[in-house]
Amino acid sequence: MKKIALILITGLLAEAYGNEAEALKADSPLVLVPSNPSKCKLEKGAGPDGADAYVVYGDPKSKAKGYLTWSCPRVEYSPGTWYGVAVDVNRESCGSEVIFDNAFHRELRSSYLRRGWHQFKTCFRTFDGTNAIVDAYRIQEYNSQGRTAFANPRLVELRPEWRMEAGLELGAGEMAIGNRYTFNNDLKNPLSSCQRPFLYATMGARTGYKLDATGTCEYVYRFTLGNRSWLSASVVVAPTELVGPVKIVEFSNDGGKSWVQVGAMTDARDHEFTLPPELFPCRELTMRIRIIGADGKSRVQFRQIALEAMFDGAPVRLAGATRVYEKASGRLFLEDSARDYLTETFGAQLPASSHSLKVWAASSGRKVMRDAAVPVASTERILFKTSANEAESAQLVFTPTEDIFDIRVSVKKFDLPGTTMQILRERYHRVTLTTDQRGVSGWWPDALMPQDSDRLVVKGGESQPFFLRVKPPKDAKKGIYNGTLEVRYVGIDGQKTLDVPFAVEVFGFCFPERLSLATTFGLNMGVVANYHKAKSEADRRTLLRKYLKVLADSHIATHPITLAKPTLKWTNQNDPDGVKLEIDWTEFDRDMTEFYDGLKLNNFRFRIEGIGYSDHDNLHEPVIAGVKRGNPQYERLMGMYLTEVQRHLEKKGWIDGVWVQTFDEPTSQHFEYVRWQNSLVERYAPKLRRLMTPTDGPNLAISGINIWCPVPYHLHTEDLPKCRTRGDDIWWYICCSPPGTWAGMHIDHPGVDLRVWSWQSWDENVTGLLYWMVNWWTGRSGYADPQRPQNPYLDPAGWGKRAKPLSRAHVWGNGEGRFIYPPVACADARQSETVLDGPNSSYRLELLREGIEDYEYFAMLKRLDPSNRLLKVPESVTRRLDDYSTDPTAMEEHRIKMAREIERLKQGSRDVGHDEQ
């Protein structure tokens, strides 16, 4: 089929397409007509490069919700055919749902559509059959909040190709490591409908952002692996919504001639089914998911389907990849090879390595999977390169041929007194459903555990990493310092001991204590108190101190950093002339002195009383001292309060670090309210920096803001340069699920992600990182009973807040909202006694720390030489926000170059150990 141009026109053409009109075909222009000509308008030349724009106008103040649609009423699709849709989009206001929709496919990707013209692409496959299928194609916006424009839309027939290697064909979502095969149909991936195992869906079943089925219908997948035979398998099916009759999962090993039911689903939770032995061995497995006893109200949506299987033959290491081409032109339309990093070999064997136990070193930037390949390369020692007062990390990995037990690693000797070395065991978490196309089902490392947390067993053929973190003292002098690690373990023939040499090269400068990159991460002390069973204010303060210390060691400031609030005492508040305000700062000042000053933090959030702090789900009325907004006395009281807050923070020397936030993630319907809030703060306390997390990027329509904090894919707006010019700070945040090709914070993402986030921050002149929470350990969507919360060690998923377990499930991603873990003694919050131990860190938090320290190298170098060529981030590290290297080598090499340059520029200093205090 030739490429089809989608031509949109106004409602004047709608009458031409009644039920009896001939369906438009391949070489005919497809005509889209508006559902509401007063709100869907053609704007000549308003698109990119002078193209016409097809615009939807919504009213952010309207409470009415509904669809505004541009559609081609009748399109003829060939059966069993792949198609792609490409359209330029400029979504000027967030808060709505943009939907690309027909009978085969329903694509929602609203959070990734942004201000400024950019191209959106998606794929789908039509139902099998012998006859052409006539249906509409729709571009819709639900609950439109403003202006959204489309241009240059086109529909093309596609031809998919899958990676062929070693006689095996694997596509995106598939992986074979050793003799283990995995498949995840990540539905956030625009190529999910072009995955190799997807065979067909019947009428009523649609692919897209979620598998969406109503009435009687079915989805069918077929799994083959060349000439290999399947030996065993299990499948996980995860509904997000399930209403009506039973949905059953069936498998066939004879191409669908006979079926075996392996499970049934009656509620919206993750369902895992093991396939019965009588299906094996076999060359192919066909899976069918269908609704039985359907009625008009039947509905099911799936967020993911995952299959794990063992196969025969020689072991392999292969990640699948998919490319889809436009059939008529041969041009590449989309591609996905997001899992390639999982098959790479890295690291080097150490002298202690033997036939029965491989001992090897790996960069901290590589996640060591249990099935990691042992490297062929060798090295004489583990080498750390760092400055005085700076932490640096590496991994020590053990891969035995037979089971070993109770590995313990300790420092036997070291030449540099005052150096601290943490040696933590990496704990694996079973990921059954991936966050996005970067991940794979299996065991992923994350929590960093004390070595005495339990008795460790390492199975033969599997790898176990230890995370090493070394930090020289402030007064350490330039040089190379040698040391030895002692390793003890129990093998099949008893206790064993071996030595592992290491060295620390200390650069000729000292790392600063208070850093340049602002970080502010949410900490929920209510969750901490619940898990630890804190019984008193003293318990809560002890825990706060320990949690803040662990996070500050990775340069993370939290919001809040104190449980204390200034106490306001009003007298005569109803008397405009006699009103007085006294603020008791005692407890607040005590905590700020201990935590903000003592931990050398570089920013803190101050929560303003009376301003009506809100978010897009919860609007709160501004009230201070019982006086509501609208009362003439309200602004007088707020003015007195804000003036005193600024005066006190200036007096204490904290004014440069403070910022305030009045509204979280406002949409256009909230802009007027946000303008009022921040203008009030600016009027009476102008030195309090005012932060906003805009859902559609920096936007000067909102006045009073001087810290803009968008998500990365909403950073580049037309107002961004203007914000910079007037001196505003630019921070950013990641939340829930950034697109899978962007750096994220999830457990099942490449190890470098959180480190490269700081490199991209420097590259984009971003000066702050924000994250919503570090200890979201349980969510009501997955764990509705508050007395039986989630154990984050056993379930890595970040579950949503809303509890509708029988009909809906909402999950954000693996590790979402979680950078630290509770102690094992209170991991499920079901113990009776109070636990006062501090939290356990995570691999991801440590890599975030390394990125923050890399950022400081850039900042130090810029202070010494503002035009230095090394201040440019190499393209070998990151080319675009959605195109970065998953190999940490280029980052590590550039960091060393910067260190050498800083040393060179500091030559002549008599005491380089104290230059950067």
Regions found by a protein language model. Give the residues of each.
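Extended acidic/polar, glycine-enriched regions
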Residues: 296-299, 399-407, 413, 455-514
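Surface-exposed binding patches on compact interaction domains or structured appendages
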Residues: 339-378, 391, 401-468, 476
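Short carbohydrate-recognition loop motifs
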Residues: 43-65, 199-215
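Extracellular beta-strand ligand-recognition surfaces/modules
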Residues: 85-87, 121-153, 277-297
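Catalytic domains of carbohydrate-active enzymes that cleave complex glycans
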Residues: 173, 178-186, 323-338, 609-674, ...
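Aromatic-lined carbohydrate-binding surfaces of glycoside hydrolases
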Residues: 444, 452-453, 470-471, 481-489, ...
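Extracellular ligand-binding interfaces
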Residues: 62-128, 144-146, 239-263
